[in-house]
Swiss-Prot record:
Protein known as: Zinc finger protein-like 1 homolog
Organism expressing this protein natively: Nematostella vectensis
Protein family membership: Belongs to the ZFPL1 family.
Zinc fingers classed as B box-type: ranges: 1-43
Membrane association type: Single-pass membrane protein
Domain of life: Eukaryota
GO cellular component entries: Golgi apparatus; membrane
An example Gene Ontology molecular-function term: zinc ion binding
Main localisation: membrane
Cystine pairings recorded for this chain: none
Length: 252
């Protein structure tokens, strides 16, 4: 453990092999972004280091670099090529550091200057968006066809039988007995189409037919009776005053 020499005076166990000083994460980002940084205990065991990118063996002083959360440093282009060489269906946990095999992507709740810089540099790459929680691609709006069929819909048989629906041109007209009977009969036909078992359906149908026959007979009888009375009242042969054989004396 040591104390960083920056104004923050953070206690840290990270050690810069090149400058041989303890460094905190703020200094890693601002002043030691290309340095080889490991734990102070590691430096005590082996102080040798090679400031090159292990993926291309190029010097870390050249090109843009990125530091992973394990503190290993690589060229940004090299780590990008390395990740793109993996299968496209690789899970975020499958992207690991080429050196220590620790995960490249930081945990969701991990917050530090190194993590923020790592997210900033990897957010521009397509393979890292899923691991960083960035939407891969915006959802495209669904395109609906605006084609409208000009075919006139055919009238269903049920609609043609249902005469209880009034049309605009005759809905205010007076309804007669025939129209009422036709609408009632149409409703009865539609009712019979319902799929239910009524044990008294045959009896009801017979009673209804009998009632209609009696009603028709009474109606015809009344009509003919009235017509006969009117004809008899206006028949000159039934007028006693028109009969020459009948004499009617006038009162004096």
């Amino acid at each position: 453990m040591g104390l960083c020499k920056c104004p923050k005076k953070k206690v840290t166990n990270q050690f810069c092999f090149e400058h041989r000083v303890n460094v905190c994460e703020y200094c890693l980002v601002s002043s030691h972004s290309r340095c080889i940084v490991k734990s102070y205990l590691h430096w005590l065991q082996d102080s040798d280091y090679n400031p090159v990118c292990t993926l291309c063996n190029g010097n870390l002083s050249d090109g843009d670099v990125v530091r992973l959360i394990c503190y290993d440093v690589f060229h940004l282009s090299c780590i990008n090529n390395f990740a793109q060489s993996l299968p496209p269906n690789t899970a975020p946990a499958g992207y690991t550091c080429p050196n220590c095999k620790n995960g490249i992507f930081p945990p969701e709740k991990m917050v530090s200057p190194v993590v923020e810089q790592l997210k900033q540099k990897l957010s521009a790459t397509s393979w890292a968006k899923a691991g960083l929680g960035i939407p891969v691609a915006p959802l495209e709006p669904l395109l609906f066809s605006s084609t409208v069929s000009r075919k006139i819909p055919e009238k269903r048989p049920e609609e043609s039988l249902n005469t209880s629906v009034d049309h605009d041109e005759n809905k205010y007209q007076r309804r007669g007995a025939i129209d009422w009977f036709s609408r009632w009969f149409g409703n009865r036909v539609n009712t019979k189409k319902q799929t239910y078992d009524d044990p008294n359906a045959s009896l009801k149908r017979t009673m209804m037919i009998f009632f209609l026959v009696i009603l028709a007979f009474v109606t015809v009888t009344v009509i003919f009776t009235r017509v006969g009375r009117n004809a008899a009242a206006n028949d000159p042969f039934l007028d006693p005053r028109s009969n020459p054989h009948i004499r009617v004396e006038k009162d004096s």
